[in-house]
Amino acid sequence: MKSDQQRWDERFRKEGFSLGKEANSFLRKNIHLLPRGKALDIAAGEGRNAVTMALYGYDVDAVDVSPVGLKKARMLAREMGVRIHPLVADLDTFELEKEQYDLIANFYYLSRKLIPKMKKGLRKGGRIIFETYVVDQRDLRTGGPRHLKYFLKHNELLRLFRGFRILFYREGIFREGGRKKAVASLIAEKI
């Protein structure tokens, strides 16, 4: 059985960028709601979101299990004329220092064990932007993880960020990039 790193390295070795170079649409549409400063991109992959945040003036740490993906992220940053700080780490054991970031971005990666660490790593007044699949995605069969543990239950994302000020939340089936996706999307502020 392949490790997570082997699996993602294999995917990212393919020519081009697996998800393209343009940032996640939820990030692009809502970046104006996010505080400037130090940012962390969780499961950064090939860097499309990290590079976009850097273009908007963020000092970005991009963490991912795949050194191959992060090498492409550095290349993309160079191409776009910005810098990011790639960090190769297993997110199952990744630790964040207390109140280290003004913004933490998490797109299409779900580790419930990481969420308390994300909360700890966010400064007061800092924000989380988070989007990932909900259980309805399995019925759509338009992509996403295979295992149920990688899907949010209905309203679970709201519960996971209880105690934060919810600035934006949506959950449902949306058409993006020519296909339907069942997602939960959240922007929340640490109070």
Regions of interest found by a model, annotated:
Residues M80-L91:
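Conserved SAM-binding strand-loop segment of SAM-dependent methyltransferases
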Residues G126-Y133:
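Conserved beta-strand signature within the Rossmann-like core of class I S-adenosyl-L-methionine
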Residues L110-L122:
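A short, conserved alpha-helix within the catalytic core of class I
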Residues S66-V68:
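Conserved SAM/SAH-binding beta-strand->alpha-helix loop
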Residues G172-I191:
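Core SAM-dependent methyltransferase catalytic element
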Residues M1-L34, G37-G45:
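Conserved class I S-adenosyl-L-methionine
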Residues F94-L103:
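A short acidic, Gly/Pro-enriched loop at the edge of an enzyme's catalytic core
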